[in-house]
């Protein structure tokens, strides 16, 4: 059995936390690290997965407003790396980019759900305290900058997904107008592909 550690990586949205920490509220992003990969979730306006992958603990891939805060070992799992890939892919059906909601379905909700599946443990409550606070102040989500909802790594994934769909449409249009049989090009691997 694998007995692989399940790690919660927490990122500080450092400039806003200078103001909110005195209120006892932090603004945090999180992802789950397993098998040397980190899976996280963010919002975008499209009906495909908002789950993306980054190098564990690398805040630069998320964007300039993020700073790595800490790694918390939540437990361990006997799921294999292939099992984890299937689980994340299946979760992508629920965690679509256009389903992101600050209070009900954010990156921390995803991290907690994945952690529960992998090792039976939720993430610490303090990581997602903003969701509770924003439920008390309903207009808060509309005041937050877009980059809080869509980290840079996810923006890259979305661009790649949309480019792939555009190329598929162009290929389909070209093959429809060409009477000869064409072989579809092999998909290009990308570092930050969204999970379907």
Swiss-Prot record:
Annotated keywords: Cytoplasm, Hydrolase, Protease, Ubl conjugation pathway
Region annotation (Disordered) ranges: 159-196
One of the record's GO cellular component terms: cytoplasm
Molecular function, one GO term: palmitoyl-(protein) hydrolase activity
Subcellular location: Cytoplasm
Stretches assigned to coiled coil: none
Biased composition (Low complexity): 172-185
EC number: 3.4.19.12, 3.1.2.22
GO biological process: convergent extension involved in gastrulation; proteolysis
Job description of the protein: Has deubiquitinating activity towards 'Lys-48'- and 'Lys-63'-linked polyubiquitin chains. Exhibits palmitoyl protein thioesterase (S-depalmitoylation) activity towards synthetic substrates 4-methylumbelliferyl-6-S-palmitoyl-beta-D-glucopyranoside and S-depalmitoylation probe 5 (DPP-5).
PANTHER family: DESUMOYLATING ISOPEPTIDASE (PTHR12378), DEUBIQUITINASE DESI2 (PTHR12378:SF6)
Protein name, per record: Deubiquitinase DESI2
Organism: Danio rerio (Zebrafish)
The encoding gene: desi2
């Amino acid at each position: 059995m694998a007995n692989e550690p399940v790690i919660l990586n927490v990122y500080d949205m450092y400039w806003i936390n200078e103001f909110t920490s005195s209120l006892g509220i932090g603004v945090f992003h999180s992802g789950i690290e397993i098998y040397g990969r980190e899976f996280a979730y963010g919002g975008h306006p499209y009906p495909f997965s908002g789950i993306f992958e980054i190098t564990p603990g690398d805040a630069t891939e998320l964007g300039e407003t993020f700073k790595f805060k800490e790694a918390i070992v939540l437990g361990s799992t006997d799921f294999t790396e292939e099992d984890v890939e299937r689980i994340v892919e299946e979760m992508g059906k629920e965690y679509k980019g256009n389903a992101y909601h600050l209070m009900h379905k954010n990156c921390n909700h995803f991290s907690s759900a994945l952690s529960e599946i992998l090792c039976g443990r939720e993430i610490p409550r303090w990581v997602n305290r903003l969701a509770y606070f924003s439920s008390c102040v309903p207009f808060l989500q509309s005041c937050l900058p877009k980059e809080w909802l869509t980290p840079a790594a996810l923006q890259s994934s979305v661009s790649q997904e949309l480019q792939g769909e555009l190329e598929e449409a162009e290929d389909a249009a070209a093959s429809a107008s060409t009477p000869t049989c064409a072989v579809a090009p092999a998909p290009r691997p990308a570092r930050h592909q969204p999970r379907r």
